[in-house]
């Protein structure tokens, strides 16, 4: 991290900002792909999720007090953060179903509810959660929710368990199942204002999807390279694996699919820069589907080409998948 910062490779993700490198979404997308080639690059350059999205929220929507208390240490890499949106009892594809609540009592928010897949909450450096919940149930359905800053050490905040993905717990970062029991924070901890949670979410999730998709493309490129290397070095029945069955077709399909996903994602990034997140909503939705499907397909093919080695610790393919 120190070397990355000394070289100016720090907070590269913040577009049009005095805090970062001033890169556009399109420009940063290429860097995100390179960072996706290894699991620690984003961490080294202070460009890890969910901190990137949380910092963008605080830059765009946070008050000066919120920025001084939480944005500055995040930008300096001194602390980590979490994002709490998904809940265990409702369909996460429809966030208007959210059940967690915050009630205003004597100038404080009293928060109750559960969240899971709370990204970043397992990191011991995590000090703050951006928590989305219902604050104004009487409003129109997309104006009922707010985002509130909740310090991790607030009484009533409990990490119930860490969620595993295919057996991997993503330590030391991780995704937590959390409970919030009468958690009390000042009214001033609400970001932007009451009922503006969805407005913030749309601003937050667009750039994050560019980052995630391009990192997935970077990972797919690594899997592709490993697949090509293995297919030419490994022999069966006197021939290289690449020359058996339809393996050349598998390699060719992977090359085309990676290129297609990259171009689709870069198009979305360009459109966000030129016209804004709202106009680019369709393209952002497309890449959220296309890039992960492509990455899963390419990594799966690479695993198959490696045989048993593909699912063991000797190669990164299993954890990438």
How would you describe each model-predicted region?
Residues 91, 116-123, 207-211:
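Glycine-rich phosphate/pyrophosphate-binding beta-alpha loops
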Residues 77-86:
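A short, Trp-centered hydrophobic/proline-enriched beta-strand micro-motif
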Residues 97, 155-184:
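Flexible, small-/acidic-enriched active-site or ligand-binding loops
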Residues 48-55:
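Short, conserved phosphate-binding/catalytic loop or strand-edge motifs used
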């Amino acid at each position: 991290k120190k070397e990355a910062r000394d070289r100016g490779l720090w907070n590269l993700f913040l577009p049009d900002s005095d805090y970062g490198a001033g890169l556009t979404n399109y420009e940063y997308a290429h860097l995100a792909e390179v960072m996706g080639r290894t699991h620690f690059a984003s961490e080294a350059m202070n460009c890890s999720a969910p901190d990137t999205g949380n910092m963008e929220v605080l830059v765009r929507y946070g008050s000066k007090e919120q920025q001084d208390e939480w944005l500055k240490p995040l930008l300096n890499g001194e602390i980590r953060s979490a994002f709490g949106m998904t809940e265990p009892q409702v369909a996460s594809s429809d966030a208007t179903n959210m059940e967690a609540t915050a009630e205003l009592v004597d100038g404080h928010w009293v928060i109750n509810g559960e969240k899971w897949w709370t990204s970043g909450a397992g990191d011991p450096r995590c000090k703050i959660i951006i928590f989305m919940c219902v604050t104004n149930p009487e409003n129109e359905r997309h104006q009922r929710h707010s985002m509130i800053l909740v310090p991790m050490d607030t009484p009533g905040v409990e990490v119930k368990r860490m969620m595993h993905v295919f057996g991997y717990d993503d330590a030391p970062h991780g995704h937590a199942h959390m409970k919030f029991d009468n958690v009390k924070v000042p009214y001033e901890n609400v970001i932007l204002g009451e009922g503006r949670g969805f407005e913030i979410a749309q601003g937050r999730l667009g750039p994050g999807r560019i980052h995630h998709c391009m990192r997935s493309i970077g990972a797919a490129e690594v899997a592709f390279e490993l697949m090509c290397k293995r297919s030419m070095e490994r022999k069966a029945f006197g021939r290289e694996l690449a020359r058996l069955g339809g393996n050349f077709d598998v390699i060719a399909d992977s090359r085309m699919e990676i290129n297609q996903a990259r171009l689709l994602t870069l198009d979305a990034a360009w459109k966000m820069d030129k016209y804004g997140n709202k106009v680019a909503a369709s393209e952002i939705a497309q890449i959220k589907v296309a890039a992960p499907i492509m990455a899963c397909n390419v990594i799966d093919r690479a695993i198959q080409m490696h045989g048993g080695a593909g699912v063991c610790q000797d190669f990164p393919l299993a954890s990438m998948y």
